[in-house]
Structures are given as C-alpha cells and as structure tokens.
A protein has these predicted regions:
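A short acidic/glycine-rich loop-to-helix N-cap element
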Residues: 138-150
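A small/polar active-site loop signature that marks catalytic segments
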Residues: 2-78
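Short, Gly/Ser/Thr-enriched beta-strand-loop segments that form substrate-interacting elements
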Residues: 95-126, 135
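Short, glycine-/Ser/Thr-/acidic-enriched flexible segments
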Residues: 6, 52, 112, 137-139
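Short, well-ordered beta-strand elements
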Residues: 11-14, 119, 128-138
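Short, gly/Ser/Thr-rich active-site loops of penicillin-recognizing serine hydrolases
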Residues: 32-35, 152-162
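Active/binding-pocket-proximal capping segment
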Residues: 77-91
Length: 162
C-alpha cells in the first residue's frame, strides 16, 4: 500500500480497525483507536478519513516528523527501504524530479492544489536514515518546478550527510 497510494485500502484498514473493538464499522471510531495507540506523539492530527491528505485532514510537518521517528523506532532501518517507495524508481515517486538522481530518498508525497509535501527518510552515504518533511504551501507555479526545488534541497542535504 505504501508504494502505490490506494485510498480505498487505507480507508478500509481504518474501518477494519474499528471493527476489532465493536461490531459496527465506523471511520471515526477507527481513527480514535489510532490516536489512543499513538498517545506518545506530541502533535495532534485532525483526520476525517483513512485516506490521508485531504482539505479536511490536518497534519503539521512536526507531526509528520514525529510519526516518522516513531516508525523508525518501531521497524528500524532495514524495513524502511522495503515499505516506502524509492524516489525516481517506484510507486508514486517514479517521476519525482526526474532530472536528479535521488535514489537515497524513500518517502511519500502528497499534493493538493497549491500545496505539496514530501515526507520520508534520506539515507546518508553510510546508510543512516534521517527523517525529513518538506511542505510547500500556497505556491502558484507548476508541480514539476516545486519537485525540482525539493530535489535540489535533498541533493544538497545528502552531500552534507556522512
């Protein structure tokens, strides 16, 4: 599910989670269960469905970064590369900033009109993962220009990492 975005599957998982605590399948109950399981996160999310990015769901870059840190603590380095798509080669990131080689980035993207976000891990030359979130809001240019700028920042950062 993480390599190719599938909102139907994501929504179904939230509904199934709610069904483990009650007989009725209910999105809000499933989301409440997710919040209860992740009480250690300091940032709060406002989620209206299981699909993730929408005009009604709210998540801050800090909240996404906390989530990435928790994922790393839970599954470690080896599984990150199998779960998230690699930039420029698979999933929803297959055409992300194609003019740059970003094979050291494993992430998920989200975009709505005039908003673009990329969250995931950048791997150093020593194969150490660093969580990152880049969120660009209220831009009026085309998405490809934003992706190229994000790609340039990630390339710059990768050169600085050891």
């Amino acid at each position: 599910m993480l390599h190719d975005s599938d909102n139907l599957v994501a929504e179904s998982l939230v509904l199934m989670l709610s069904g483990t605590a009650q007989w009725e399948l209910n999105t809000q109950k499933g989301l409440e269960m997710l919040y209860q399981q992740n009480k250690t996160l300091k940032s709060q999310f406002q989620q209206v469905d299981g699909s993730g990015l929408s005009r009604y769901s709210l998540a801050s870059p800090r909240g996404l970064l906390e989530t990435l840190d928790k994922i790393y603590e839970t599954i470690g380095t080896s599984k990150i590369k199998t779960l998230l798509p690699q930039t420029n080669s698979e999933g929803t990131l297959i055409r992300f900033a194609p003019q740059q080689n970003l094979d050291f980035v494993y992430a998920k993207s989200g975009s709505l009109r005039n908003n673009h976000a990329l969250a995931g891990y950048i791997f150093s030359k020593a194969n150490k993962p660093y969580a990152f979130v880049i969120s660009v809001n209220n831009y009026t240019g085309d998405k490809e220009a934003i992706q190229a700028a994000i790609g340039a920042q990630l390339s710059f950062l990768h050169k600085k990492l050891r």
